Structure formats: structure tokens, C-alpha cells
């Protein structure tokens, strides 16, 4: 029986990078006889333009029925002035929560060919390979109450709420320990337990879960220190587990250790490893339509999809090796280009990866 993948190109550079990822997916499908069925729909700004909503009900049903979802990127300035509840990003938050995608995997891996692209000294980042596991469906982005009000003195005030339940923390902590077991057996839990009540519960529950993983070395770190340590000595980390907002910030920071966010894939998984896969970068409306966007993060997201949802590690390895081969050939999109390498566009980079397969 064929496996169904829902393709959501999204906004900005999304359709351009998705076209290259789909080329790679079709080639790997043909080579390995995977039998994927691809279904297309809209999410974000393009969905708002087409359906009047950033996530249409029928799109959500297609996502529920699919085995995996592959997303480009959402957002753009043309939707900045619409009702906040209908902005592209709300569609992304809704599909994550409705599909129960609570675990966001964001690797920060430095390809040796791109060591010069990092703004840090080569000796600080050489060999970097860490994974940030971000809780994705709780915390301050979803917490209620939230809103705006006018105080008695006429001053405007805005407020948000940062709640976490024991069960939400337990399941992401367990996922963190499981990932650490597959990697270097080190887990660092990042919180702000010196100030936040939610972080105090977070730390307590992580400690409880740790009792089931005696083989994993657990450490705790405050988020401000973690941000500093990521720049000072990033190779001390193997797996970092943290809440929604801290993970959002730290994973973007970690991405630049590698030289370009255009290289980094991500996976968002439910309890059964059904997932949505997308590049870590945004929709980059400033370069949309110019044919210069880096498709490698989206292509590597396909590899993550094959690995985590479909358990096809050999096919995933083939894509990752093909990306390495293309970098060995000196091909670079503008964001990772340096003197002595060959600058290519989005389509040429996608074609090169297909050829390397």
C-alpha cells in the first residue's frame, strides 16, 4: 500500500525550494521503490488568499490522512496587516497543535566543507553535531489567557501566559532521553528555573524521567547561560531539550554556528513518529522569485522524513551523502558561497543533488 505525503509549498521561497525537494524525493522513490503518493495543498499566506484561512479545514483533514507532511515556509509582509488570527503563522501553529506534533527536532550539523561559512573560529565549530529538541505545542505560544487591555490610567497593556503540565513535560523529556540514547548519551535540559514556576516544574519532571535512563548523563542549564555556551563551546552539547519559546530562540542561534540556516532541516513528530518536515529557515520574501534560495535544508528535511517517519535509513543516508558530494564539488548557493567555490541557483543545486544520487 502506498504511503501518502502531503506537500505544502507555502509562501515566499517555499514553492521554489519545494520543487527541488520533490525532484529529489521522486528520484529516491524510484531508486528504492518506496511507492509514495504526493498530494498538494496550501498553508499560510497562499492558503489565506485561496481559502480565506491560513489552514483550511480540508487541508487539515488531508494532513491527518497523510503519513507525513512536507512544508516549505510560511509568512510574508503582504499579510502583516490582516487580522492576527488569520496570519500565515497561525496556520503553522494550528497544524502543529491539531496533529499533536509536540516534539521539534532541529539538528545543528556543520558540514566540513562549510567550516569557513561559520562566523566562529573553525576550531570552535569543527565537528559540531548537536540536536535541539523543542517542545512544540505548549508554553507561551499557546497559553491562555493572552490579550490586550487598557488599564485604569488609560495605558495599554499586553499579556501572555506560560503554562506547562506534567504530562507535556514528561513526554518531551522522554523523547529527549530516547534521542540521547541514539546519539552521544548526553542530555542537557534548558530552563529558567531560578525565576519561572513553569521551569521549576519542568526541571522536577525531567529529573523524575531521568530515573528510567540511568545510562544517560543529564545536566541542567539556565537558558541565558545556554545561549552563551552555544557560542563559547557548542561541542559540549549532544542533545538539548527545552520548552517552546527557549527552543525557538536557541535553535535559530545554533543554526548560525553552522554558517547558514539554509542548510538545516527540522522534524516535528507526534507520539507515533508521524511528522511534519520543514527547513529551519523562513519564507525569505526578499529573495522570493529570484531563483537563488538554498534548497538544501528542504532536501535534508526529506532525508529526516525518510529516517524518522518511514524508517528508511538507507534512503535517508543516500540523500545526505548526495548533499555532501555536491558540496565536495564546490557548488554553493549565495548564502554559503565563498571565494574559490561555484555559485549556483536553486534549480541547479537541486539538479546537482539528483545527479549525485
Swiss-Prot record:
- SUPFAM superfamilies recorded for this chain? Isocitrate/Isopropylmalate dehydrogenase-like
Bilayer-spanning residue ranges: none
Q: Tell me which UniProt keywords the record has, alphabetically.
A: Amino-acid biosynthesis, Branched-chain amino acid biosynthesis, Cytoplasm, Leucine biosynthesis, Magnesium, Manganese, Metal-binding, NAD, Oxidoreductase
GO MF: 3-isopropylmalate dehydrogenase activity; magnesium ion binding; NAD binding
Tell me its cofactors: Mg(2+); Mn(2+)
A Pfam family of this chain: Iso_dh
- The answer on whether this UniProt entry bears the keyword NAD reads yes
Q: Which reaction does it catalyse?
A: (2R,3S)-3-isopropylmalate + NAD(+) = 4-methyl-2-oxopentanoate + CO2 + NADH
InterPro entries in UniProt? IsoCit/isopropylmalate_DH_CS (IPR019818), IsoPropMal-DH-like_dom (IPR024084), Isopropylmalate_DH (IPR004429)
Q: Tell me, what is an example of a GO biological process annotation in this record?
A: L-leucine biosynthetic process
Write down how the cofactor binds this protein. Answer: Binds 1 Mg(2+) or Mn(2+) ion per subunit.
> What EC numbers are recorded for this enzyme?
1.1.1.85
Q: What cellular-component terms does GO give this entry?
A: cytosol
Residues binding substrate: 96, 106, 134, 224
Q: In which pathway does it act?
A: Amino-acid biosynthesis; L-leucine biosynthesis; L-leucine from 3-methyl-2-oxobutanoate: step 3/4
Question: Where are the residues marked Important for catalysis as a site?
Answer: 141, 192
Q: Which residues bind NAD(+)?
A: 76-89, 282-294
Q: What does the annotation say about its assembly with partners?
A: Homodimer.
The Swiss-Prot or TrEMBL record describes its family as follows: Belongs to the isocitrate and isopropylmalate dehydrogenases family. LeuB type 1 subfamily.
Recorded hits in NCBIfam families, A to Z, give: leuB
What name is this protein filed under?
A: 3-isopropylmalate dehydrogenase
Its source organism is Xanthomonas axonopodis pv. citri (strain 306)
